């Protein structure tokens, strides 16, 4: 990470050297000496407006006001007032700071604010309009960092981050203080609580608070102030993500286990109000993590790797490659060989987004779920029905663990599942697809039957305030949420291949990678993955549900020990990790005697497992007799159009601007001109799908520096005077540094270039007299000077769809339209089968594939923004990589293929094909399959239509 994020690299070396020293130091190196020297220097330095230990008096004063307010308010107002106070500070944290960080990550907004306001410019230069603010900030920051820091010489990114830290300190301190005061206001002792429960409640609560404190301190020890205050949102250092200490124990410890203290305080306060507001605050923090931090981490530290480029060694090899694509009956029916022998995941099963009712597995699951729901809702909750629902759940759990485990065990030792399909002439890919359907159906029915049984056994409490009814429901819901989160994390780490035990079916298994939740736990499904069944048992308080939970947990552990673990040891051997991050952290903290005890327990468990395996191996032939396998045969895409949101902002006074000086014209050097109409009186400008569009504009010399140009579809805006529909990011500023977003300047080539323009004798300054097309008046007089500029719209600033569009020039950051460009069209050319030589046989696709490649390559290059890093230069060169969450390039290609060839693919198909050659082969075969249903004639054999011309 040798560059700054979204801002230019500072020339100052002090920042880099200071961080480089910190990086070179060991993580656990003591720093007391350095801190002591800094403290001594700070003691000698005169401090104004700060306490002797360096804490801001303003922050302490606001905290003190909170405490005073607690004692001044009457008792009946304390709880609501401090609830509002805490929620306000929490909103300032999660919404306020979250918005600032989001804008800084994507647009460098805070750094742009600092540049625009010039608050860090030395007043001696005469360019700083706020000299007093400059002096105040300088005094504050130099007091905060007494050594190794120069306010004048530090990069603007670093100074901006330091000011941001002061705001964060205020919000975080007030957030925690208001929460503690709210807990004090709500604190009480239950009337029926005995002394033993009181002691237990306080001991556990204090333990959670101390654990929370240790997590925060250890996290700060590892990440230091740079990551603690989100420094990488402002600038980057040559350092990767750190996983040490508490970061080895749990994912995002400051947001997960780092909130244990909130629940400890709730326990000590013995208040459900504190508990519920703690859950709300914790949920808001997770939303902050998901919406702000995770996207920035993915963008900064987990960028996709550079693509592999194909280099042709010599012309002879290229000639052989071309000749190999000639039509032949033996080669054309076989797809290009995949460089990886693993199955391509193009039609996933797991998740609502992958639901496909055309697939028999999904439709069967939906029908069975409806049946379960109907039976559960329409039958009474009598003991006999409860018994049958619990029995049904137990049977499905046995099948899910024992039956599926038996199939996987046979597949691991003798490949029985794959052999069955090979026996009937099918491939191992077909066996894999059928297995995925069987496992997915079994898992769904197992949990559906469990939920139905829990519903039958559940009864609403008659009195929610009696006993622990509320607490049991809260804890139960928390355990269910924990299992859902664990399952999602496992799927994100393993993918479709690992979720369905792909290494049981394919020998070419990928190398083990311990990422995601597996960084901390070897088998998260052993405990966390079954937390939800215990949550249901806790909510229902039913002995039958406790039995089901115990059965589920026992069978789950047995499945891991008897099926998964032996196969993993056989497949990966010494590549398996012995201890996960959490276990390593716990072992490091254990005394030697406990470590010896742990080793003895491990040996006993290993010997017991070996004994059970020997018994099962002996009984397997008898158990296998008469056992048969069950076989089952195995999208809708929604195109979302942007909402028409009115966001009109109008400048009331346009006096002083010559409307005839405003013009906007589309550069026609890259467009295709087509005659429109029989008399050829007009021309239609047509641009290729995805090609960059250059725009030239002119404006008066006194035009606003906040003018901007937007791209709109014709018909979106009913008015030619005012734009009332959002551009959805498809706009470019006319001048640098005018808006709080670096994206607004993306595409800006030149601005405010003074040029000469012929004048008009009847110059009008009324908005209604403007020329929307930017054409000059016929009555010409002496020329005058105007400002001009050029910009290019490309990538995300284009409409990735066909249609007729226009550019609009807007005034002063508002939506007054000063000029409108000539309409132009974005079009995808239809692929004409008539271009293929007529001698191509019906069973040979060589020329067809080549023609499709030639037609498709420039479109695909446009879809990848013509970026040399990701855009293919040849049909054989692979596409660039993109993350799972951002499929914009694949979506563009899917739309282009659909419009060009009339064939609709999923985005996963484009990603799996990987290059234009494979995609062209797939299109060619899809056209052959769909030829009998096509509305156009085909060069191949098809049913005669009896018509003399093609249907349009």
UniProtKB/Swiss-Prot annotation:
Q: Name one GO molecular function term.
A: phosphatidylethanolamine N-methyltransferase activity
Q: Which UniProt keywords apply?
A: Endoplasmic reticulum, Lipid biosynthesis, Lipid metabolism, Membrane, Methyltransferase, Phospholipid biosynthesis, Phospholipid metabolism, S-adenosyl-L-methionine, Transferase, Transmembrane, Transmembrane helix
Which Enzyme Commission numbers does its entry carry?
2.1.1.17
Transmembrane portions of the chain: 57-77, 81-101, 167-187, 195-215, 249-269, 272-292, 365-385, 387-407, 441-461, 464-484, 544-564
Q: What does this protein do?
A: Catalyzes the first step of the methylation pathway of phosphatidylcholine biosynthesis, the SAM-dependent methylation of phosphatidylethanolamine (PE) to phosphatidylmonomethylethanolamine (PMME).
Q: Which domain of life is it from?
A: Eukaryota
Membrane topology, record value = Multi-pass membrane protein
- Please tell me whether the keyword Lipid biosynthesis is annotated for this protein: yes
Q: Where in the cell is it found?
A: Endoplasmic reticulum membrane
User: Part of which pathway?
Assistant: Phospholipid metabolism; phosphatidylcholine biosynthesis
Q: Does this UniProt record's set of keywords contain Kinase?
A: no
- Identify the residue ranges that face the Lumenal compartment according to the record: 1-56, 102-166, 216-248, 293-364, 408-440, 485-543
Q: Where is this region: Disordered?
A: 1-27, 302-342, 756-786
Gene this chain is encoded by: CHO2
Q: What is this protein called?
A: Phosphatidylethanolamine N-methyltransferase
The similarity annotation says: Belongs to the class VI-like SAM-binding methyltransferase superfamily. CHO2 family.
GO terms of biological process kind:
methylation; phosphatidylcholine biosynthetic process
Major location category of this protein: endoplasmic reticulum
Q: What ranges does the record list as Low complexity composition bias?
A: 760-783
InterPro entries reported for this sequence: Phopholipid_MeTrfase (IPR007318), Phosphatid-EA_MeTrfase_fun (IPR016219)
The segments annotated as topological domain Cytoplasmic are 78-80, 188-194, 270-271, 386, 462-463, 565-952
Q: Which GO terms describe its cellular component?
A: endoplasmic reticulum membrane
Catalysed reaction equations from the record: a 1,2-diacyl-sn-glycero-3-phosphoethanolamine + S-adenosyl-L-methionine = a 1,2-diacyl-sn-glycero-3-phospho-N-methylethanolamine + S-adenosyl-L-homocysteine + H(+)
In this entry, which stretches build a coiled coil?
A: none
The Basic and acidic residues compositionally biased stretches are 319-329
